[in-house]
Amino acid sequence: IDKYISEHSLGAFRPKAVLFDMDGVLYDSMPNHAVAWQKSMEQFDIHMTADDAYATEGARGVDTIKKMVKAQQHRDIDEEEAQRMYDVKTSIFHEMPVAQIFDGVKELMQKIKECGMKIGVVTGSGQRPLIARLINDFGDFITEERIVTAYDVKNGKPAPDPYLMGMQKVGTKPCETIVVENAPLGVKAGVAAGSFTIAVNSGPLPDSALTEQGANIVMPNIKYLADHWHEIVR
C-alpha cells in the first residue's frame, strides 16, 4: 500500500469502492469455463488448453476467439462469426453444474459495506443469466447499475476500459478504487486503470503470472482477503 501511495503521489490511501471480477473471484466457475472452452473450440478445429482458458480469462469471449482463429487458422473473422462460436461455448457452460460462491465472498462484501464503501462487479461475460444470478446472490451489496459486462465496453480486459467504466458507475476516481482480480489480463486492466489491484490466485497459474502484470498484492484465496480486510483499509 505504501508503495502504491508513493507511486501515485497520494497523501494517503482512502478507498471508496471495490470492483470485483466475477469468474474465479466471486464464483468457483473457472474449471467449468475451461472445459466449456475446450469442448466448444474443438467443434471449430481450434485447440485450446485449460491453461489457455485461465490465461485469457477476463477478456471478451469474442476477442479470445478472434485471436485463437487468427493464430491457428491464419484468418480474420468478424464479430458475428466470433459471437456464433462463443454462443456454442456459452451453451456448453450452462449445461454444466452451477458454480458455487467462494467461501468468504459475502463476509468480505459485508465488511466492505460496513466501511461505507460501494461495491461493483466488472466482468468480461455478456451472459444475461449470470448477471441475473449476481443480483440474486449479492442483492444486499450490488445493483445492476453497478455491473459492467462485455456489452458495456468496446475494448475488454486487458484494456483499462471495463474498470474505468466500473469507476464511472460507482462514482470514484482510480486512486479511490480497489480492484479484486484473479486473472493476468484482469490484473493488467486494473493496474492500467490506475487502481490498487489485489490478485486472488484461485487458479493453477503461478503467483508470478499476476505480479508480472502489476498486482499490488497477491492473496491465496478470497477468504484470506476477507480475514485480512481491515489491514488493507486501516
Kindly give the residue locations of the regions a language model identified.
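Asp-based, Mg2+/Mn2+-dependent phosphohydrolase catalytic module
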Residues: 1-16, 80, 110, 126-234
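Anion (oxyanion) recognition and catalysis
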Residues: 42, 113, 191
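A metal-dependent, Asp-based hydrolase signature
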Residues: 58-93, 103, 111
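Structured helix-beta-strand junction loops
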Residues: 59, 115-116, 213
